[in-house]
Amino acid sequence: MTVILATIKWIAVVLGAMIALFILGLVLVPPLTRSFTDSWGATEQETATTFPGDDIIPAPRENSTKAITIDAPPQIVYALIQQMGQHRAGWYGWDWFYNATGSSDFVDGHYSTRIVPELQAVKVGDRININDAVAYTVIEANTDQALVMLAGSLTAQQIGEPSQPETWSANTMAWILRPTSAGGTRLILRMRADGTETGFARWMWNGPFNFGGALFSRKTMDGIKRTAEALAQ
């Protein structure tokens, strides 16, 4: 009996320590890494540049710029980006997470390592699902150059207008493609957000959710790079 109680106590201590470390991580890691994750891979010039979609949320509470160089032409990279989404070609990241959270049902059963012909005609007004409850609306689709999407409780026309409700949220995801001199692509992801969240909700969005989103965004960019470069061979 003493051995059993000692074992239970040991398990409780270990679990308590793990929970404490997790909470400590939620509090400390996001602010300590924010300056890095908000500009992951981007140059100072890229972070300071105005890109398509910036005018939708002109004075954002959240603003980040991530970038990666891909040894594949913009045509291939854009094709992969415009086919992303739930019930589409996936997110080029951790499929197990999207399966677990109901954000998958991808056309190939996992993120597609091919260009899917039937998903190559994205246009303004199209909705790209994150999951069954949340979707982005395409605001700008400039083939091989930029794909800008908006999510939240507002339309692009409502932001800053008298019709804007008292409680709202909005965030943009802009994929910017720039050809490189070597025939590749400089892929830039500009994300901006604003809203009326306060207190704990704002802390969660500014801290843990922002940090987690940075990790998933980078994983997606790495997946796009890997897939595009394989297709370019």
Task: Name each region found by the language model.
Residues 1-6, 198, 202, 206:
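Juxtamembrane/transmembrane-helix boundary motifs in multi-pass membrane proteins
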Residues 2-37:
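N-terminal type II signal-anchor transmembrane helix
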Residues 8, 49-52, 57-61, 69-71, ...:
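Glycine-rich portal/gate segments that line the openings of hydrophobic small-molecule binding cavities
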Residues 24-63:
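Short acidic N-proximal helix/loop "leader" segments that mark the beginning
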Residues 38-40, 80, 173-175:
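Tryptophan-centered motif/residue detector
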Residues 201, 205-221:
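Short, charged, low-complexity patches
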